[in-house]
Amino acid sequence: MSCEDDWLNTSDDEEKHGVFGGGSLELQKLERTHRNRGYRDGISSAKEENLQEGFDMKFPEGSRLGFQVGEVIGKLQTLDSLFGAQDSELRSDYKEALAQLQISRVLTHANFSEQMDATEALSSLLARWEGALVKYTSRYIPNV
């Protein structure tokens, strides 16, 4: 790309006289200010559009993930409320699940790729607690 192609480059004439040929320093300053603001507004607008597009693409996955975590915690909490007093393993697992499935721990950069896809580590974590849920459900509610 040559300097002539760069619309942000100003020629010496534009610097001296402004785009519209005005020689006033105040007018030149005003033109420069508006040109810079227009450039920044364009950059900001492009960033917002890309951010919104990324949000729109990944929101369903994040929503599903949040629902999945909430469902595991809720069901383990119910089992703990009903049977935790007599089952120390269940109570211990429930407390550990609460700690490991905190949203601030689940939604860390380490659990997602550059494309914001869930990593194997996150999938393994969820599979572990879903497995525990199946174990305790079949132990206490065998017909489910």
From Swiss-Prot:
GO terms for biological process: protein maturation. It comes from the Eukaryota. Keywords: Cytoplasm, Nucleus. It is found in: Cytoplasm; Nucleus. Residues 38-78 are annotated as: deca-GX3 motif. Coiled coil: none annotated. One of its GO terms (molecular function) is protein-macromolecule adaptor activity. GO terms for cellular component: cytosolic [4Fe-4S] assembly targeting complex; nucleus; Yae1-Lto1 complex. Belongs to the YAE1 family. The complex LTO1:YAE1 may function as a target specific adapter that probably recruits apo-RPLI1 to the cytosolic iron-sulfur protein assembly (CIA) complex machinery. May be required for biogenesis of the large ribosomal subunit and initiation of translation. May form a complex with LTO1. This is Protein YAE1. The gene is YAE1.
